[in-house]
């Protein structure tokens, strides 16, 4: 397993981010999704295939987190292999090519986010099957190389239930075994991570964390809550 760098979050996840499976991390804007994924990759010590569909990956931020944690920023940057598909068609090509690129020398694959290009397509219903195929390729990569794959997801407001829900909920939910939701709280910089589904941990557990120059850190006086 890969550590998140936050002890309470690792405990919530049963030790960290699982290998050989897809982990879905979703939430609204500025909840810490990208920071968490970057931090996990940084602390993994290996190469990271990072697919950035939203332009949210920042080399400067990665360098800042590395330096704040006493790591070499240049070494950190050299370990991240960045892909920037411009549309859903190119995203399909990039993910397909990962089968030739990723091997056991990689410690992590991240898609940030898996649904950004999917959402802007006019005929989204026709692309649901294609999204499922991309997830299946990512799952194959995870299993073949025994590494974690993190798929970051966006949210949308579902007027039928009057709450925010993950985009393509059923398509992603079918293939992602562990699902973590991140939410903002009223206190500046304070966030909460809620475990919505896991292979062997109780659902509904939560931990509080802060976003700092070091990335994701334990919240001061933060606590973990496990709900059976």
Question: Where in this protein do the model-derived segments appear?
Answer:
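Anionic group-transfer/hydrolysis microenvironments
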Residues: 26, 54, 114, 155, ...
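Structural motif
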Residues: 23, 48-49, 107-108, 148-150, ...
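P-loop NTPase motor core
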Residues: 85-174
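Phosphate-binding/switch region of NTP-binding enzymes
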Residues: 140-228
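Conserved P-loop
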Residues: 18-97
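Pre-Walker A adenine-sensing motif
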Residues: 4-17
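Conserved RecA-like P-loop NTPase ATPase core
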Residues: 9, 25, 62, 80, ...
């Amino acid at each position: 397993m890969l550590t998140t760098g936050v002890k309470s979050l690792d405990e919530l996840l049963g030790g960290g981010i699982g290998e050989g499976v897809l982990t879905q991390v979703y939430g609204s804007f500025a909840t810490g999704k990208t920071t968490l994924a970057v931090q996990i990759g940084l602390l993994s010590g290996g190469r990271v295939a990072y697919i950035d569909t939203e332009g949210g990956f920042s080399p400067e931020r990665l360098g800042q987190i590395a330096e704040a944690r006493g790591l070499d920023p240049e070494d950190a940057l050299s370990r991240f292999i960045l892909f920037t598909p411009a549309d859903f068609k190119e995203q399909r090509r990039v993910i397909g090519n990962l089968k030739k690129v990723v091997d056991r020398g990689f410690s992590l694959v991240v898609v940030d986010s898996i649904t950004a290009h999917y959402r802007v397509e006019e005929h989204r219903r026709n692309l649901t099957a294609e999204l499922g195929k991309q997830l299946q390729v990512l799952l194959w990569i995870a299993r073949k190389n025994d590494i974690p794959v993190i798929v970051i997801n966006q949210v949308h407001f579902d007027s039928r239930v009057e709450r925010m829900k993950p985009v393509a909920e059923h398509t992603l939910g079918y293939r992602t075994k562990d699902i973590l939701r991140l939410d903002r709280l009223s206190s500046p910089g304070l966030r909460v991570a809620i475990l919505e589904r896991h292979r062997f941990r109780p659902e509904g557990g939560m931990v509080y964390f802060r976003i700092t120059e070091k990335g994701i850190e334990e919240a001061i006086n933060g606590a973990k809550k496990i709900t059976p």
